[in-house]
A protein has these predicted regions:
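Long, intrinsically disordered low-complexity tandem-repeat segments
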Residues: 1-40
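Intrinsically disordered, low-complexity segments enriched in small/polar residues
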Residues: 44-398
Length: 398
């Protein structure tokens, strides 16, 4: 939604039901892409290349990840899924050798701008094949609460299964809920990293992908051919196609962009240029249990990327670009009658919560009460739902 109207009522982040991307182009119509290299001054990666196409990170093995702006939820109660309000711009750290801090260059990866206390979610629309994706927040697993690891685990599970998992809005809190990702500066102790580990060293977001083994991938392709054959016969009989494991579910539309106001930082204390993720309100979203045996996945990651979260002033200083406008007013969004969403997969099992993540407190305990107006959406507003490669992104030492 770019003009305040819902295009088809079944899109959350620009991926429409017909498979066409409504908002997949960069703001100027050009695809900004690039390879990420392995450390400062390193050589380009080949098989392990993470690439940027538009604002989408494409990891080896088929995972696609976009960072989506959204409405911040109140820290009390459990809410429907908030909408997408457009993508965060993503840039390679290696493209700014003269302005990016040495610490960023050493870690490699990409950067994106966030306001203090801004909410985000991760979209996996466009993920091409089954992939186990690890998501870290300050090198703490957002699924298990365990320290970052280069190996997959199922006790507890420390990864998401794509494309079955269509998106991730926050850390796993079990019982069909997650707690929203909210940006905070390092140094307060408010990040998930600070609360779980007792220190704030890394910040940012970490992504790591594991493809299926060759044998499991061959079996997956065989099952997909059988599934497509069944769907084709169903369509010929006029029946409705089922969701299935092999394709991501339909997403929701981007909400109206915030007005083009001056890109001033959000109210509150001036944040550090280094940002991490804390948690905000709770929402109805499941983190799905993997129904494959662990042996189906590769033992080593195919690729990884460090995502630096930076303040708007630091973004402007490093890139020379204006950051996106301040986030849209959430009460005004709801008053306008625009949609919120519910998503439930009856064929999947939700992961149980972990002690480490259950103990994480909301950022309001550090930043103060959330005074932004809130208006509960009406039941009618809650909608139930069921490219060529670019240059590689540089990896580094983290």
């Amino acid at each position: 939604v770019l003009d305040g109207k819902v295009r088809d009522g079944n899109v959350r982040d620009g991926k429409a039901r017909d498979g066409k991307v409504r908002d997949g182009k960069a703001r100027d119509g050009k695809v900004r892409d690039g390879n990420v290299r392995d450390g400062e001054g390193g050589t380009p990666m080949t098989d392990t290349a993470v690439r940027i196409v538009g604002n989408t990170l494409r990891l080896p093995g088929g995972a696609a990840v976009r960072f989506v702006r959204t409405l911040r939820l109140p820290e009390t109660g459990t809410h429907a899924l908030p909408p997408g309000l457009g993508e965060f711009p993503v840039r390679r750290v290696a493209d700014y050798p003269d302005t990016a801090p040495a610490e960023w260059r050493a870690r490699g990866g990409v950067m994106l701008p966030v306001y203090l206390r801004e909410a985000m979610w991760l979209s996996f629309a466009g993920s091409a094949r089954p992939t186990a994706l690890q998501v870290g927040v300050g090198k703490v697993c957002a699924v298990s609460g365990k320290p970052w690891s280069d190996r997959l685990s199922q006790r507890p599970q420390n990864y998401l299964v794509l494309p079955r998992q269509p998106w991730l809005d926050g850390i796993n809190s079990g019982n069909g809920t997650v707690r929203q990702f909210v940006s905070v500066p390092l140094g307060l102790g408010a990040t998930v990293e600070g609360q779980v580990t007792g220190e704030e060293v890394w910040g940012g977001v970490q992504l790591q992908s594991f493809p299926l083994s060759e044998e499991a991938l061959a079996e997956h392709h065989r099952q997909e051919r059988l599934r497509r054959g069944r769907l084709g016969r169903q369509r010929m009989r006029g029946s409705r196609s089922a969701g299935g494991f092999g394709a991501a579910p339909p997403m929701m539309s981007a909400a109206p962009a915030a007005p083009a106001a001056s890109a001033a930082p959000a109210p509150g204390a001036a944040p550090s240029p280094r940002m991490g993720l804390g948690v905000g309100g709770s929402m109805r979203q499941e983190v799905y249990e993997d129904d494959r045996p662990l042996r189906d996945w590769s033992e080593t990651p195919a690729g990884r990327v460090f995502v630096h979260l930076v303040t708007p002033p630091e973004w402007r200083r490093v890139t020379g670009e204006a950051p996106p406008p301040s986030p849209v007013d959430r009460a005004a969004y709801t008053r306008a009658g625009l949609p919120w969403y519910d998503y439930y997969d009856e064929d999947a099992r939700d992961l149980a919560p972990t002690d480490a993540l259950e103990a994480v407190k909301p950022v309001g305990d550090w930043l103060g009460e959330d005074l932004e107006p809130w208006q509960q959406p009406s039941p009618e507003q809650v909608i139930p739902l069921k490219d060529p490669p670019g240059k590689p992104v540089e990896d580094g030492d983290w």
